[in-house]
């Protein structure tokens, strides 16, 4: 029956998958906390207009929206940044700056599915508000490098491509593109590496760009060297100065080997204003692992006073595909330390007492609740990833002991229950 299948594009998480998810999230949290970030959360359900104000047409078309029982238009969050902006705006002036927060929310987008992309995913978000210098952007890059190192990835496997929305602004200014046309052009440019050149050119022309403008955009945004960018934009380019400062600071962090300038990185969302970046597998086999950048003028789109801000979103699906490709998925056993089993049904009450005493001491114990054969119990204990099997037998218990089998070595010993 179709109603017994999960909704297309969503995932069930069985215990082994939850262990892997917990492992991944623990490294998300550790990388952020090592850099002084605090965790926050927000509702999954928001007013639809929160996302249709300034996010860009593509994300608006991907919203899961509906009308609630009171006739309000609401949406499942497609990303976390608008919710974060709402939270910051609601306490404007009361929050000490800079704000360094992170979250791991579930996000929803109705989009085409492919490897590393579903219609729901968990997204690690790390943001800094109230710091306008490029130092904050480099701090975010350092958080990413800390995470990659923790999960066993190296600069040979992952690269951080960076540019600035100011590069795009200067290029488009030079060919006379401004206003609403700017946001539409950004979306096409964000797809340059994914679309055939002829199709991208056709989309530019649909937006009213002439051949000369298209050639200028494609040439400048195809650059991979900051010196070449300086030649194209001029030595007085604000964008070039900003990116050179970013590169210098990255050297101070010791993360420059992860970084590479890529003029085509613009990010598709309309609210970015400065440095932007994406993490990619060097193999080129996967879509972007994560992406982010500076969004200094977001709050004014909600009617508030702008506050400098920068951040990134990092989905859980692509990184797991990359870790599989690199052989870095860990083998994770369950959390059970001991399995307790009464060999005689009359000893079940005593087994409950032993298990309760161990749990009170903080040990993870699985108590076999039904009458089972010892062979089944051994298989069960190994399946749980338990360290020991605690057996209650009449003879040993009369002498004040239980039998304990070390499941790694197979060695058995007798131990007093209160010494477990």
Language model region names:
Residues 17-35, 46-47, 70, 81-94, ...:
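Positively charged, Gly/Ser-enriched RNA/tRNA-binding surfaces
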Residues 162-170:
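Glycine-rich, mobile lid/loop segments that gate access to catalytic sites or pores
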Residues 9, 40, 44-74, 117:
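Polyanion/phosphate-binding surface patch
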């Amino acid at each position: 029956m179709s109603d017994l299948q999960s909704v297309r594009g969503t995932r069930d998480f069985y215990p082994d998958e939850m262990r892997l998810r917990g492992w991944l999230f623990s490294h998300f949290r550790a990388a952020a906390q090592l850099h002084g970030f605090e965790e926050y959360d927000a509702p999954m359900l928001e007013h639809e207009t929160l996302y249709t104000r300034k996010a860009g047409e593509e994300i608006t078309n991907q919203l899961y929206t509906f009308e609630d029982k009171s006739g309000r238009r609401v949406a499942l969050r497609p990303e976390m940044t608008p919710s974060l902006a709402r939270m910051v705006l609601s306490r404007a002036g009361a929050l000490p700056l800079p704000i360094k927060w992170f979250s791991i929310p579930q996000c929803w987008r109705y989009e085409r599915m492919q490897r590393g992309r579903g219609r729901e995913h968990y997204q690690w978000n790390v943001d800094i508000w109230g710091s306008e210098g490029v130092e904050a952007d480099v701090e975010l890059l350092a958080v990413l490098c800390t995470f990659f190192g923790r999960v066993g990835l190296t600069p040979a496997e992952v690269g951080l491509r960076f540019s600035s929305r100011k590069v795009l602004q200067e290029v488009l200014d030079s060919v006379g593109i401004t206003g609403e046309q700017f946001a539409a052009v950004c979306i096409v440019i964000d797809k340059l590496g994914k679309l055939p050149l002829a199709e991208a050119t056709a989309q530019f022309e649909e937006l009213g760009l002439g051949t000369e403008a298209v050639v200028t955009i494609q040439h400048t945004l195809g650059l991979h060297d900051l010196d070449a960018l300086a030649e194209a934009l001029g030595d007085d380019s604000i964008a070039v100065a900003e990116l050179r400062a970013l590169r210098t600071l990255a050297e101070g962090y010791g993360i420059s080997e992860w970084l590479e300038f890529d003029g085509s990185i613009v990010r598709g969302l309309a609210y970015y204003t400065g440095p932007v970046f994406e993490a990619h597998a060097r193999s080129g086999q996967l879509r972007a692992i994560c992406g982010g950048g500076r969004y200094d003028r977001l709050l004014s789109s909600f009617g508030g006073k702008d506050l400098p801000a920068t951040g990134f979103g990092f989905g859980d699906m692509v990184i797991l595909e990359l870790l599989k490709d690199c052989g870095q998925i860990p083998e994770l056993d369950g959390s059970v330390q001991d399995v307790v089993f009464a060999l005689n049904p009359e000893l079940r009450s005593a087994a409950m007492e032993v298990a309760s005493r161990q749990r009170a001491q903080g040990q993870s114990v699985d108590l076999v609740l039904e009458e089972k054969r010892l062979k089944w119990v051994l298989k069960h204990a190994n399946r749980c990833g338990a360290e020991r099997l605690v057996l209650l037998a009449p003879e040993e218990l009369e002498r004040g002991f239980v039998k304990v089998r070390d499941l790694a070595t197979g060695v058995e010993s007798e131990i007093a229950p209160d010494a477990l």
